[in-house]
Amino acid sequence: MPDYKYGILLQGRVSLWLKDIITEYKSNFPEAHIVLSTWNTEDVSKIDCDIIQSELPVSTYPHSNTTNHQIIGVNAGLKKINAEIILKCRTDQFIHNKKIFELFNDNCPLDKIMIPDLGTTLDDDYRASDFCQLATSKILNKFWNNITFYDGKYAISPEIYLAKNYVVNFMKDTKPWNKIMNKYFHVMKYHSDFQIEFEKLDSDERYSR
């Protein structure tokens, strides 16, 4: 059994907001295990939580995105975090809802991943938002442990690549996306449920990887 009921896994670069994000999470979730998974190029001297640092992946060609960054960073963090239910989120966004874990417990079946509606649609196959995920450790490990690295040979957004891998390659489900999205994902409101505040939308800092 994990030592913690709840955990928060922050994955990405050390952003301008990260120190304040961790401070808020410690205040809102004092019993949670908080882990930062970042790169060995990042200065973590002022970060007050458990930390794991990984080597940056080589850029893919001719197309490049953050898919492999997420695969490496999240898997490293999942090995470090010691919790039953995990909120996987970015290092450049606040999730302000103090009752986010209660929301999960009350609404999301344990075999699904709770995600925000922004960036999620039935109209674009396998587009399931990767802004954050909330699920049991078992389900998150299923999602992230079984992904082949993106080779850059074709253009595809990270969230589509990741969700398609989970649904089609791992779960072996080839039914139409608009018929099965809700089988694997529980969609909640970005603004009112997760209460996300995103640095990318509020500053000119480079997109966090």
Protein language model regions, located:
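N-proximal low-complexity "stem/linker" segments adjacent to membrane-targeting elements
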Residues: 1-16
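Short loop->beta transition adjacent to catalytic acidic/histidine clusters or analogous donor-positioning motifs
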Residues: 4-6, 26-36, 49
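Soluble or luminal CAZymes and related metallo-dependent hydrolases
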Residues: 13-17, 65-76, 154-161
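Short, well-formed alpha-helical segments that are part of the catalytic scaffolds
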Residues: 15-28
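Active-site-proximal specificity loops/subdomain of glycosyltransferases
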Residues: 37-80
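Short aromatic/hydrophobic "clamp" motif used to bind/position activated sugar donors
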Residues: 86
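Acidic donor-binding/catalytic loop of UDP-sugar-dependent glycosyltransferases
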Residues: 91-105
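Catalytic core and acceptor-binding pocket of nucleotide-sugar-dependent glycosyltransferases
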Residues: 95-98, 113-209
